Design a protein with these regions (language model features):
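Membrane-embedded alpha-helical hairpins and interfacial helices in multi-pass inner-membrane proteins
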Residues: 35-40, 48, 68-174
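Hydrophobic transmembrane alpha-helices
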Residues: 2-61
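Extracytosolic (periplasmic/ER-lumenal) interhelical loops and adjacent juxtamembrane/interface segments
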Residues: 63-67
């Protein structure tokens, strides 16, 4: 008997397990590489996981939860935790949408993190309260976050995805 809501596999035990594993791997990678995972210039190795929606829809909520937990456990302030997780969620949804074209799908984490996380890093951690906004510094933060994301997604993430595509698809199904 199927005990899922509306017979949707999105709520299957296996789907929940897959999403949970994605979240756990994201958290562990972020915290193991903490010195390079946070800050104005970041190279978050865990972002390889942002390409997992290419393989399975269960990665989308898993990445949201994983990013939320990693940012919280990493000591982020509330709007960094919230907005960083939203950036990851938006990127995951778009990555899933373009899953048939992995090189194109890999650009979405770069775009959303550069546009959302870059300003968050600037306003939360770089700019002192009361100081005027420095547009060059803001743009620098956006660029460094985007560049780190681009490097991780294309240099590490795409090879990971192409390797995973050689495995049986049933491994990623709920």
């Amino acid at each position: 008997m199927n005990h899922t809501s509306n017979n949707s596999p999105c709520f299957s035990t296996r789907g929940l397990a897959i999403g949970s594993m994605v979240a756990a791997i994201y958290v562990v990678l972020t915290l193991i590489f903490q010195p390079i995972s946070f800050g104005a210039i970041q190279f978050r190795i865990a972002e390889v996981m942002t390409l997992m929606p290419i393989m399975t829809p269960y990665a989308v909520p898993g990445l949201f939860v994983g990013c939320l937990l990693a940012n919280w456990l990493g000591g982020g302030i509330w709007f960094d935790v919230a907005l960083g997780s939203i950036a990851t969620l938006l990127a995951s949804i778009c990555t899933r949408r373009f899953r048939e074209k992995p090189p194109l799908a890999a650009i979405f984490p770069t775009i959303f993190n550069g546009l959302i996380v870059g300003p968050v890093v600037y306003f939360a951690y770089v700019r002192a309260p009361g100081d005027p906004v420095s547009v060059p510094t803001l743009l620098f933060n956006m660029a460094t976050v985007a560049f780190g994301e681009l490097a991780v997604c294309y240099a590490l993430g795409l090879p990971m995805i192409y390797g995973l595509k050689k495995l049986p698809a049933k491994l990623f199904e709920g």
